[in-house]
Amino acid sequence: MVIQETLRLYPPAAFVIRAALEDITFKDIMISKGMNIQIPIPILQQQCDLWGPDAHKFNPERFAHGIVGACKTPQAYMPFGVGPHVCAGQHFAMTELKVILTLILSKFCFSLSPGYQHSPAFRLVIVPEHGVTLRVKTA
């Protein structure tokens, strides 16, 4: 649940780009066939109407009943993209992440330094704008 919530708030990629397959009108916007559409994943995954009033807060419990229970529209959860262009390495990345976290957390304890300033910067990938200073102790 913690990994899913982290990926919801801080997805590996900031955008998904898709080409419209046909002419379509969305609200008052005309989208022509072939037009590229950028989907800002971090914004989509923090919409209060989809994720609830605490959409901007870190709340791993929202995934207690899986993605279907976390979001009104499960397709809005797309940290690795969606559809035929989904990241081919997503399952490997999740397995690797779980193994590495298990190894690291079994040997070390981490805490943020008092001067830490939370500042995600949305670039090609999301990075901490001012870096992250951690205190590390052996477990």
What are the language-model segments listed below?
Residues 42, 109, 125-139:
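C-terminal helix/juxtamembrane-tail motif
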Residues 36, 43-44, 84-85, 99, ...:
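Conserved beta-strand elements of beta-rich interaction domains across eukaryotes
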Residues 1-27:
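Conserved cytochrome P450 K-helix E-x-x-R motif and the immediately C-terminal K′/meander segment
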Residues 37, 90-127:
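Cytochrome P450 heme-binding "Cys pocket" and the immediately downstream C-terminal segment
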Residues 3-7, 59, 81, 98-106:
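Amphipathic alpha-helical interaction motifs in eukaryotic regulatory proteins
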Residues 63-97, 120:
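Cytochrome P450 heme-thiolate "Cys pocket" and heme-binding signature region
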Residues 39-68:
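Conserved cytochrome P450 K-helix/beta-meander segment immediately N-terminal to the heme-binding cysteine loop
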